[in-house]
Swiss-Prot record:
Coiled-coil features, chain-numbered ranges: 186-210
Domain of life: Eukaryota
Upper classification of the organism: Eukaryota, Metazoa, Chordata, Craniata, Vertebrata
Protein's name according to its UniProt entry: Methyltransferase-like protein 25B
Metal-binding listed as a keyword: no
Species of provenance: Homo sapiens
GO cellular component: membrane
TM spans (from-to): 406-426
Positions of disulphide bridges: none
Keyword Membrane found: yes
UniProt family annotation: Belongs to the METTL25 family.
Protein location: Membrane
Keywords linked to the UniProt accession: Coiled coil, Membrane, Transmembrane, Transmembrane helix
Principal place of residence: membrane
Length: 475
């Protein structure tokens, strides 16, 4: 899916993009605000213009991926069965034109061609205990952090919200960086420390097997700290150097791989307020967990725009995986019916208990193998209702017959979702620029592997052409 590069926009261009985004999101708010599980209870299909209904009705999932989401299958030619209304075409074009591009600047063969579980660009010790998605992420972000650290003369990297320490471990033991790893969960920190020792032993064994590989400098494991970072206050532990710098004060680089909700905001605030922090490389996620207010908006510019508000539902939608869903549409698997089944279940719940709206239904396994009445009975039991309630099977079957409409409506919302993410990240860019800092957004992960793939890079000195180097793959 094409889009716009943040690097191609001036400061004024970024401000105008924020204006355009708030206007477009206000125009299509009814689609973004809708909950797909209320498709039948709220008659969502009839909220669409009649001309849109005619264009979308009857489209199969692969056609939706190709025509609506603009993601055709390999070698597929886009063919419309009818002339679409200009308003629908305008929606599609606008969604593509105003969203930040998610395609990385590098074009290299997949690191998972030989083995879908093992990155060919990480050695075996660094792949152990690490899922393929995470292998890709720690390698790409770690390499970017190493380059950014070299460019800005950092003495220490601080990995905030480090979890099991996979990124910290790769940066410290794979790239030779001095790393402090901060995580609030004691259990995760203890596991990270065990994995550190396991990796050190594996690297020592590898050196003994390959004596020609000489370790030129001593290895430093990450320094782990158990600490919750309060988004509203400065964390002194975060700023303490691991060792006394040779000359002057420490120079810190803050990073966070999918720092959840307000944790990403905390990184920005520490970067802004603390002279010791000279660089930032942050990949955010879980936008629905942002404090409101407090986590968004951050910039004065966005806060002053009419229609800047992004309620919970919109921020939640921004966390969906567009590329992954388009791939599911192309495969047209039976798993797509889950939304339709859940929406049908909602009608039964509302009839039984009108005040019970959108209750959480714990995952029902193998939904695609169940008849609708079996699914409804299991769903009723999960929300504390009698699974033997009398069911209107004819009505349920009528709902199931509208599965493609449910998928089409959800695809519309998914088409717009990147605009919400773009506005959130653009607000962060503008927040940093308003304070005189240099900030860019770079897509560094493959979006098929890692949907939240935009890293916010910020420095207190201009990087110039160095930004192009940050995006490139290491050989």
């Amino acid at each position: 899916m094409p889009g716009i590069s943040a690097r191609g926009l001036s400061h004024e261009g970024r401000k105008q993009l924020a204006v355009n985004l708030t206007r477009v999101l206000a125009l299509y708010r009814s689609i973004l605000d809708a909950y797909i599980i209320e498709f039948f209870t709220d008659n969502l299909w009839d909220t669409l213009p009649c001309s849109w209904q005619e264009a979308l009705d009857g489209l199969k999932p692969p056609q939706l991926a190709t025509m609506l989401l603009g993601m055709p299958g390999e070698g597929e030619v886009v063919r419309y069965r009818s002339v679409w209304p200009l308003t629908l075409l305008a929606l599609k074009s606008t969604a593509c034109a105003l969203a930040f591009t998610r395609m990385p600047g590098f074009q290299t063969p997949s690191e998972f061609l030989e083995n879908p579980s093992q990155s060919s660009r990480l050695t075996a010790p660094f792949r152990k205990h690490v899922r393929p998605k995470k292998q890709h992420e720690i390698r790409r972000l770690g390499e970017l952090v190493k380059k950014l650290s070299d460019f800005t003369g950092c003495t220490q990297v601080v990995d905030v919200g480090s979890g099991q320490g996979h990124l910290s471990r790769f940066m410290a033991l794979g790239l030779g960086l001095m790393v402090k790893s901060i995580e609030g969960d004691q259990r995760l920190v203890e596991r990270a420390q065990r994995l550190d020792q396991e990796l050190l032993q594996a690297l020592e064994k590898e050196e003994k097997r390959n004596p020609q590989v000489v370790q030129t400098s001593p290895r430093h494991s990450p320094h782990h700290v158990v600490r919750w970072v309060d988004p509203t206050a400065l964390c002194e532990e975060l700023l303490l150097p691991l060792e006394n710098p040779c000359q002057g004060r420490a120079r810190l680089l803050l990073t966070g791989l999918h720092a959840c909700g307000d944790l990403s905001v905390a990184l920005l605030r520490h970067f802004s307020c603390c002279p010791e922090v000279v660089a930032l490389a942050s990949v955010g996620c879980c936008y629905m967990k942002l404090s409101d207010p407090g986590g968004y908006p951050l910039s004065q510019w966005v806060a002053g725009l009419p229609g800047y508000e992004l309620p919970y539902r919109l921020r939640e939608g921004a966390c969906h995986a567009l590329e992954e869903y388009a791939e599911r549409l192309q495969k047209a698997g039976p798993g797509l019916r889950t939304h339709c089944y859940r929406a049908a279940l909602e009608t039964v719940i509302r009839r039984a208990r009108p005040e019970l709206r959108r209750p959480g239904v714990q995952g029902i396994p193998r939904v695609h193998e169940l008849k609708i009445e079996e699914y409804v009975q299991r769903g009723l039991q999960r929300v504390g209702l009698d699974p033997q309630l009398p069911l209107n099977l004819a009505a349920l079957q009528a709902h199931v017959a509208q599965e493609n409409r449910v998928v089409a409506f959800f695809s519309l919302a998914l088409l717009l979702a990147p605009l919400v993410e773009t506005l959130i990240l653009l607000d962060r860019l503008l927040y940093l620029q308003e304070q005189g800092f240099h900030a860019e957004l770079l897509p560094i992960f493959s979006p098929e592997l890692s949907p939240r793939n935009l890293v916010l890079v910020a420095t207190k000195m201009p990087l110039g052409q160095a930004l192009s180097v940050l995006e490139t793959e290491d050989s």
